């Protein structure tokens, strides 16, 4: 068998390209431009076909059919965080509109009050279909989540007019309300200390935000980790001062049960639409929220 001389073939290809270079300019480039346009058109048609098929498939899922048979979407929300809670209730309305567009808008949505301790149990026992109540995928990985709708910075907070201090070997207050899963603040602190071990930071655990802030006022600790939303919530009750230092963000998302992935995907479709046409920004402003907290979605 004759042995192939790849060097000769490469030289011949290089020679041909020099004689007939590929260009997109002028008359010589017209065939290539046409071919490129045809390719881009076919690719666009393929992508549109894929995306247009996704929504009907989601809307035909068993969990969506169950909600449509009931004609009511049950959403767990919070009432103790006015600004963000108002946004979340409006997102619940948008999701109900998506799932039950032909139902009576006065009855198609049932808002069920939840808190950090009851949100996931109500998902588990079927009391609610989804939760839109300041929950993050870092809290419990067994559930399904939409893309995030709010990024909440986790700030280092001290007493107002308190003395200056250094972080070295400090004990920081962190809320950890149950033994089943770590709080987002504790996870952020652990991630930070893993890369800044020389600081010797330690976590002092408290069962609730009032317990932790009471300890801060008593001088038991000198600083705490507190999401910005809670800084605003407790700022009128406690003499606290947030610093500009953030340990990261807690990204809140629409949460669906472990057997209802389509509801999380539909939540993503709803949020994508609200972001694309600017309605999410308008919702933020209507509830006094900073549009800079709208998460940057990764491609």
Where are these regions (language model features)?
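A ligand-binding cleft/hinge motif common to bilobed small-molecule-binding domains
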Residues: 118, 132-142, 214-249
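Extracytoplasmic small-molecule ligand-binding "clamshell" domains
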Residues: 30-38, 58-134, 205
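Periplasmic-binding protein-like
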Residues: 78, 148-158, 228-272, 290-299
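N-terminal Lys/Arg-rich, disordered targeting/topogenic segments
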Residues: 1-32
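Sec-exported extracytoplasmic/periplasmic mature domains
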Residues: 96-104, 124, 128, 190-194, ...
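Stable alpha-helical elements in mature extracytoplasmic
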Residues: 60-63, 87-95, 115-119, 127, ...
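Extended ligand-binding regions for polar small-molecule ligands
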Residues: 29-35, 48-58, 89-99, 161-181, ...
């Amino acid at each position: 068998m004759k042995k192939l001389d790849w060097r000769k073939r490469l030289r011949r290809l290089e020679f041909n390209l020099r004689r007939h270079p590929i260009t997109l300019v002028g008359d010589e480039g017209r065939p290539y431009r046409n071919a490129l346009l045809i390719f881009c058109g076919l690719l666009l048609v393929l992508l549109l076909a894929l995306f247009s098929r996704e929504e009907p498939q989601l809307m035909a899922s068993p969990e969506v059919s169950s909600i449509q048979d009931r004609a009511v979407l049950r959403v767990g929300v919070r009432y103790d965080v006015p600004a963000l809670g108002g946004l979340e209730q409006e997102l619940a309305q948008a999701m109900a509109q998506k799932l039950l567009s032909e139902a009576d808008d006065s009855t198609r949505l049932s808002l069920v009050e939840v808190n950090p301790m009851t949100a996931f149990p109500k998902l588990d026992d079927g009391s609610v279909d989804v939760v839109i109540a300041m929950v993050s995928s870092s809290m419990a990985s067994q559930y399904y989540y939409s893309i995030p709708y709010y990024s909440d910075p986790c700030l280092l907070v001290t007493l107002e007019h308190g003395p200056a201090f250094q972080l070295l070997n400090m004990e920081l207050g962190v809320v950890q309300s149950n033994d089943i899963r770590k709080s987002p603040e504790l996870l952020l602190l652990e991630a930070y200390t893993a890369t800044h071990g020389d600081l010797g930071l330690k976590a002092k655990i408290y069962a609730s935000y009032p317990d932790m802030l009471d300890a801060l006022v008593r001088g038991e600790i000198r600083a705490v980790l507190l999401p910005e939303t809670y800084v605003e919530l407790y700022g009128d009750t406690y003499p606290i001062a947030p610093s500009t230092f953030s340990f990261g963000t807690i990204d809140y998302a629409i949460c669906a049960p472990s057997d209802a992935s389509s509801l999380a995907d539909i939540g993503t479709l709803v949020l994508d639409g609200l972001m694309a046409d600017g309605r999410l920004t308008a919702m933020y402003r209507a509830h006094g929220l900073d549009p800079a907290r709208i998460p940057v979605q990764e491609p």
